[in-house]
Amino acid sequence: LVVKIFLESICKGTRLTTKQQGENQTESPAKIDANTLPPLRSVHTESFPLILSEMRSSLAVTTYQAGKLVFLRPQDGKLNTHFRAFDSPMGLAANQQILSIGTSGYISHFRNMPAVAQKREPIGKVDACFMPRDSHTTGDILVHEMAYGNNNELWVVNTRFSCLCTLDNVNSFVPRWKPPFITGYSPNDRCHLNGLGMVDGKPKYVTALGETNKPTGWRANKKDGGILMDVPSGEIITRNLSMPHSPRWHNGQLWVLESGKGTLSIVDPKTGKHEAIAIMPGFTRGLDFFGPLAFIGLSQVRETAVFSGIPITEQNIERNSGVWVVN
C-alpha cells in the first residue's frame, strides 16, 4: 500500500510528525516575493484522508523553503490543509500537551488548550488547539530533528554545533552529547548531525552525513559517507549510508531513511546490515509511524552543489515533494 500527498509549486523541503483528488491553496510563503511565485497547493490520493480518519489523527508537516507548518486533517471524507507561516521551520516535536517548532534562530512552543478547542469552528469537531506560549532564542544552530523525552524534556539536534542539546532558562542551548570524533563545540557543522531516534524517553540513535571533525567536512563524501550511531556510547552501527536521516525504533525494529537514495530501510543494530524496503521519488526526510503505516516526508531537492553527485539526483526521474504513506 502506498498513498501520497504532493506539496507542489514552491515547496522543496519537508519534515514531519504524526499524532477522488483533492486540492487546497494558500498564500505565498514568508520571505519570498508573493508577486513572483504561485501559491502553495497540494494534491492527494483518495485514500489519504480516509487513512487519517481511521487513525483519528492529523499530520503536521514543515516545509522550510516555503516557510510553512502544514496540518493535514480529515474532514467529511476530504483532506483539510491548514497552513501557518514560520521562518524556515524544520524540526517538530509534539505530544498531547505541547507542540514545538524549530525555526531560524529560535524554538517556538505551543500548548494544547482544550477549552479553546471547544469554541473553534466547526463546533464539536475540533479536539485540540495549540496556542503560542513562549519562544526560546537559540541563535543560528540549524535545528534539525527534535523530540520530547522523559519529564517533557526537549532534545534538539544542534547541527551547527554537531551535538545533541537541551534548553534551559539561562543559555541559548545546553550541549548534552556529541559524537566521539567531534573534539569540541564550534558552529561549523562538522558532520551534519541531523536525525534523532528516542527509545524509552531517551536519545538512542542519531544520523550524520559524515564521520569528520573538519568544518563542513561531511560535504567531501556526502554520496555514501553517512553514518548511524548509538547514543550514548557513540558506537557506529553502520557506515556508507547515502545522506541518512530520521532514525526510528518502531515495533522492535530500527528504521532509517537514506535520503540520497530515496529509501526507507531496516537496520540490524547488532550487525549494521541494512535493507531497503521502499524506494520513493524524492529526498526522504522526516519519518513517523502509526501502527503498520510509515509516514515519510519527501523533498524535490534543488540542483545545487550540496545535492550534486548523490544517487537520487543522478537518476532521470521526476522527484516529488510531499508525504508518502507506506504499509
Task: Please describe what each predicted stretch is.
Residues 42-55, 85-97, 136-153, 182-204, ...:
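Beta-rich, blade/repeat-based domains predominating
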Residues 44-56, 109-120, 206-223, 298-318:
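Short, conserved, GDST-rich strand-edge loop motifs in beta-rich repeat architectures
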Residues 74-75, 113, 168-171, 231-233, ...:
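Short loop/turn segments that connect beta-strands within beta-propeller blades
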Residues 120-194:
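Asp-box/WD-like beta-propeller blade repeats and closely related beta-sheet repeat scaffolds
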Residues 243, 248-269, 273-316:
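Loop/turn-rich, solvent-exposed surfaces of beta-rich toroidal or solenoidal domains
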